[in-house]
Amino acid sequence: MPVLATPRLIALMENAALQAAAPALDEGMTTVGGEISVKHLAPSPVGATIEAHALLVSVEGRKLTFDLSAQQLQPADDHGGKLVGEGTHVRFIVHRQKFLDKL
């Protein structure tokens, strides 16, 4: 069916969390996903504009917890629109090279 697939919605929401965390990280550091829980609430046609948001709600050492949401923007909307997904996501701060060396 020509609709937004749940894995694509999750990828958009995870990327929003990645981008939200990035400005606060020291050089050489990044985050990796550890857990995600998403509800796909409404269908969206292929080609619709989807805006994903991540709000950092908790920091426990290296563990970052985000509330996630995604909206389908309506034509001429600047923000908001139909809520198509929501959830939570946990990311962990890691040293990029040390993490890659373990692969």
Regions found by a protein language model. Give the residues of each.
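Residues within well-formed alpha-helices
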Residues: 12-16, 53, 86
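HotDog/MaoC-like acyl-thioester-processing domains
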Residues: 45-46, 55-103
